[in-house]
């Protein structure tokens, strides 16, 4: 029979929930257009910059900081642990045959799994869901346990791993820590973050917007927008 396939998604591939598994469970960290549109001042300043008008970068920085507060629930502490009781709600150890709703999704990973399922059967396709904010090496250890479960259920000694975007970081950590187990039949990396990622400080809210850098960025936006070689129609 076919080798079982495990999909490892990228950032945002699993929804994050405050108080997961409780009556108070609610999804957090989801980009909401209303959140941006409610900041009329920020939009106005960016559009003004595009139009070639002078914009105070410090004002823009304050407006960005205010926008980021809408996503403070997904913040981590300096040790990389979630500050709030936030985690994933869906951790499936069974195949996607039992999760048709996922296979009908329109984002990247469900579409990949759907195509694979059409070729080998959904009963041989699995989705490894994880909290994409947390340590890649610790997540790789969880993936190793997941791989063991899939091998035990299918009777196969090897699996095919498909990583998308930041999921390739998890696969890199898996290869580094568990590559000598010899349980990878095939490895597929899609849009791989092969040089690593540097987002830890973002989740710890340890970041700095320099006024000069913001001003230069806005200037570049203006230059690009008015460049005849770019077609924005």
Language-model regions, residue ranges each:
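N-terminal non-catalytic accessory region
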Residues: 1-162, 166-224
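Alpha/beta-hydrolase
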Residues: 226-233
């Amino acid at each position: 029979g076919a080798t079982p396939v495990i999909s490892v998604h990228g950032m945002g591939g699993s929804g994050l929930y405050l108080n997961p598994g409780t009556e108070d469970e609610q999804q957090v960290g989801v980009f909401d257009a209303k959140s941006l549109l409610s900041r009329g001042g920020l939009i106005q300043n960016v559009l003004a910059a595009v139009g070639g008008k002078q914009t105070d970068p410090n004002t823009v920085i304050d407006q960005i900081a205010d926008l980021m507060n809408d996503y403070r629930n997904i913040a981590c502490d300096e040790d990389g642990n979630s500050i709030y009781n936030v985690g994933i709600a869906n951790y499936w150890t069974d195949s996607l045959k039992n999760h048709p709703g996922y296979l009908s999704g329109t984002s990247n990973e469900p579409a990949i799994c759907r195509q694979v399922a059409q070729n080998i059967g959904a009963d041989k396709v699995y989705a490894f869901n994880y909290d994409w904010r947390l340590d890649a090496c610790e997540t790789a250890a969880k993936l190793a346990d997941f791989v063991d479960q899939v091998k035990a259920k299918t009777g196969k000694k090897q699996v095919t791993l498909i990583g998308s975007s930041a999921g390739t970081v998890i696969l890199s950590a898996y290869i580094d820590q568990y590559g000598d187990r010899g349980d990878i039949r095939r490895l597929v990396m899609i849009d791989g973050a092969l040089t690593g990622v540097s987002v830890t400080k973002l989740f710890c809210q340890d970041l700095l917007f320099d006024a000069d850098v913001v001003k230069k960025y806005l200037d570049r936006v203006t230059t690009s927008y008015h460049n005849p070689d770019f077609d924005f129609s």
